[in-house]
């Protein structure tokens, strides 16, 4: 692996990691997803609908002769609303993946001005509870 990708060993041990940052962090998260997908399946929940999988494909291409197979290791789900984020997390929590789970832009849809603040808070609390449940599984 070239040093431009995030350095770590794959497959990942069964530990949980949390990365929080500005939208600029998304490039590093795509590097993480690309690196993980070279060695194993990875589930990606894009809660802000901002991830660019073409960028992930470009990162993967130099490291494999079969980028399509590697891209098939990425299981991507996108949410456009905070209601969809909750539904997505409920579906994943009902059948937790054995592979790494990457959640991108969790808070993005909860800031929607078309959603009442109390509803957004309730949905966020429920979503955080599901993430806690997933981290313990």
What is each of the regions a protein language model found here?
Residues 85-101, 128-131:
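Short amphipathic alpha-helices and their capping/turn segments at secondary-structure boundaries
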Residues 1-11:
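Pre-Walker A adenine-sensing motif
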Residues 97-113:
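Conserved P-loop NTPase "ATPase switch" module shared by AAA+ and STAND
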């Amino acid at each position: 692996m070239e040093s431009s990708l995030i350095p770590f060993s794959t497959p990942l041990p069964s530990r949980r990691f949390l990365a929080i940052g500005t939208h600029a962090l998304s490039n590093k998260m795509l590097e993480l997803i690309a690196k993980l997908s070279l060695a194993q399946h990875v589930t990606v929940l894009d809660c802000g609908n901002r991830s660019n999988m073409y960028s992930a494909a470009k990162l993967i291409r130099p490291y494999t002769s079969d980028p399509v197979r590697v891209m098939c290791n990425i299981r991507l789900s996108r949410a456009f609303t905070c209601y969809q984020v909750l539904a997505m997390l409920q579906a994943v929590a009902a059948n937790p993946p054995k592979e790494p789970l990457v959640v991108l832009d969790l808070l993005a849809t909860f800031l929607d001005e078309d959603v009442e603040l109390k509803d957004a808070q309730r949905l966020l609390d429920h979503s955080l509870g599901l993430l806690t449940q997933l981290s313990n599984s």
